[in-house]
């Protein structure tokens, strides 16, 4: 905790969308605030812009076992152009991705506590299966396939789990060049009534 103003995570996201025109501007904005821990948990988000730059923003402290005081959490920023610390695969790739675990090294003492690690690895394997697509350039169709692959209900079912209450409520594919977004509700990728495309013409 510092003398910076407190900010909740949802308000922070709204602030970035309203006032940041690039990754650098987003990071500059976020650094002006302390993230208020209303959910008693660590946080991370990823931001990107139309230049291809991205960054993972993580708020944590020490380790998963001791990270219980939100006032002690600090922001760490990992850019896609400088994330060697995250691992060899992340260093080789020029694209980033996150699921439901903190990517900061040594945060977890046991890999089983890294919730979503299996889906994290699946994303990389789908985008860069043979190691040659380090730029992460894929078609919109393939990007949607990735989102469908790692939806919680489908993923759990394919791995022998049957919690029917687990589902990815919505998935979205953003085209930061064309300023469009394709939005899918409740993993219903094959249902045209559940797939919506929005064109943010006013941003062009």
Can you annotate each of these PLM segments?
Residues 1-18, 41-43, 48-204:
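C-terminal, well-structured catalytic/ligand-binding subdomain of enzymes
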Residues 10-37:
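Short N-terminal edge-element motif at the start of the domain
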């Amino acid at each position: 905790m510092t003398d910076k103003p407190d900010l909740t995570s949802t308000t922070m996201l709204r602030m970035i969308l309203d006032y940041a025109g690039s990754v650098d501007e987003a990071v500059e904005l976020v650094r002006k605030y302390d993230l208020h821990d209303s959910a008693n948990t660590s946080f991370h988000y990823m931001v990107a812009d139309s230049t291809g730059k991205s960054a993972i923003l993580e708020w944590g402290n020490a380790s998963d076992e001791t990270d219980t005081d939100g006032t002690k959490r600090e922001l760490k920023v990992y850019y896609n152009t400088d994330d060697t610390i995250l691992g060899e695969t992340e260093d080789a790739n020029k694209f980033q991705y996150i699921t439901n675990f903190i990517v900061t090294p040594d945060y977890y003492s046991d890999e089983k506590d890294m919730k979503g690690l299996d889906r994290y690895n699946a994303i990389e394997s789908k985008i860069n299966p043979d190691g040659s697509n380090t730029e992460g350039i894929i078609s919109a169709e393939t990007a949607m396939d990735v989102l469908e692959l790692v939806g919680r209900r489908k993923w759990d079912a394919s791995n022998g789990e049957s919690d029917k209450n687990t589902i990815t409520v919505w998935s979205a594919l953003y085209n930061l060049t064309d300023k469009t977004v394709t939005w899918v509700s409740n993993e219903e990728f094959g249902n045209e009534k559940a797939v919506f495309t929005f064109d943010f013409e006013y941003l062009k």
